[in-house]
């Protein structure tokens, strides 16, 4: 019987290290040629499987694949497309089986966040409910760091490092200008429901470099009066302050401060624009001159300042996914297990997808200071190891050198499928 081929795809928002996971998958699979045949990638996530838009990664050299480890974003294209349940849309699952059969695919690796875990779980059920043998392994990825069970999520450590460094540097800038100009700097970061990225801004200030920073978490209902009082207190004491605000901050009425009524493909509120809202509160309530910025894609694409810890974990979980599949596992996700804080040690674990899909991990209350505007030492102990270590990409003429794969299409064998 012919060796089964593997399918790998990327889903949801991309990160600085998702390609490191792809590198881990492809290199590990190539090392098991006795058990795995071809390694296909789906162009634009699960859509690539449904549309039979497959990429033959075998057309790329070992050197090119290795370069994925230091290349940001999604090498094969990503998507925001959520499979409906089997009962709701059986035709999508029949199509997946049709494509898998046509290309002899027996291994399914899906690299993404919570919604992607849900998609992977649904694909894993093809085996039991529809009789097609498939082993579906989810590879965690999300800058939001909100997947359960795993200690942290690949992608988070690097965005956390970017935010911590940026807040420290911007705070130095504001301090320089505060006497006659800007006194408050507001930066908006990602995080719809969980404040992990915003919390990373707290790392900018430590015992060797104390800085006046206010953090606004999604987990803490926003109180305008308390916020303005805290900003005013810090400006009067230090002459300036920096504010790190999560895009998902809600008022005490439960509504997003930045909700414009839009929704993304997963049905989530399309957020953004909370920084100017908060900055205007400072101007109107306190009269201080301000500047605001939105980190947006910059925070998750910044491979030049990636955390080595994050890169290593991303690669390790991609590698582990293949190893789990070869052991016969299905509907599972490799995880990061923290062994110790000092020294920081971790290992790879495994979690059932049923306990991961559609579950969000919020910031524990004891990670946030009593006033709701900062991080505790417990939080600092959790976050600090995740941003450690440098893993710079190669540079040429002052610019990082990233790889673009050939992404050669696999010839189609089936009729077109309308999504």
Labelled PLM ranges:
Residues 99, 110-112, 120-130, 137, ...:
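Accessory alpha-helical/coil subdomains and C-terminal extensions
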């Amino acid at each position: 019987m012919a060796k089964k081929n593997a399918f790998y795809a990327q889903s949801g928002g991309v990160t600085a290290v998702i390609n490191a996971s792809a590198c881990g998958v492809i290199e590990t699979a190539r090392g098991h040629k006795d058990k795995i045949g071809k390694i296909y990638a789906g162009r634009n996530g699960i859509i690539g499987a449904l549309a039979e838009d497959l990429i033959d990664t075998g057309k790329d050299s070992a050197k090119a694949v290795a370069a994925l480890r230091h290349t940001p974003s999604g090498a094969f294209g990503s998507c925001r497309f959520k499979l409906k349940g089997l009962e709701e849309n059986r035709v999508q699952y029949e199509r997946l089986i049709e494509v898998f059969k046509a290309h002899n695919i027996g291994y399914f690796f899906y690299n993404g966040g919570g919604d992607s875990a849900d998609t992977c779980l649904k694909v894993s059920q093809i085996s039991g409910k529809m009789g097609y043998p498939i082993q579906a392994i989810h590879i965690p990825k999300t800058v939001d760091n909100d997947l359960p069970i795993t200690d942290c999520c690949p992608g988070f450590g690097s965005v956390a490092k970017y935010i911590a460094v940026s807040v420290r540097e911007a705070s130095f800038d504001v301090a320089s200008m505060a006497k006659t100009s800007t006194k408050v700097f507001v930066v908006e970061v990602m995080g719809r429901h969980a404040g992990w990225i915003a919390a990373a801004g707290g790392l900018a200030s430590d015992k060797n470099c104390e800085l006046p920073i206010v953090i606004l978490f999604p987990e803490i209902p926003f109180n305008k009066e308390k916020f303005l009082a805290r900003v005013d207190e810090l400006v009067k004491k230090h002459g300036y302050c920096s504010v790190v605000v999560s895009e998902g901050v809600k008022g005490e009425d439960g509504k997003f401060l930045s909700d414009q009524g839009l929704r993304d493909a997963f049905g989530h509120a399309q957020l953004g624009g909370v920084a100017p809202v908060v900055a205007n509160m400072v101007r109107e309530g306190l009269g201080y001159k301000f500047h605001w910025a939105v980190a947006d894609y910059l925070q998750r694409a910044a491979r030049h300042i990636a955390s080595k810890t994050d890169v290593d974990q991303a690669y390790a979980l991609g590698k582990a996914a293949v190893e789990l599949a070869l052991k016969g596992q299905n509907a599972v996700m490799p995880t990061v297990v923290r062994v110790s804080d000092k020294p920081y040690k971790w290992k790879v674990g495994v979690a059932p997808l049923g306990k991961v899909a559609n579950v969000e991990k919020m910031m524990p209350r004891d990670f946030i200071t009593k006033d709701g505007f900062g991080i505790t030492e417990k939080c600092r102990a959790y976050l600090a190891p995740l941003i450690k270590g440098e893993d710079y990409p190669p540079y040429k003429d002052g610019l990082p050198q990233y790889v673009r794969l050939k992404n050669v299409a696999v010839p189609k064998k089936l009729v077109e499928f309308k999504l």
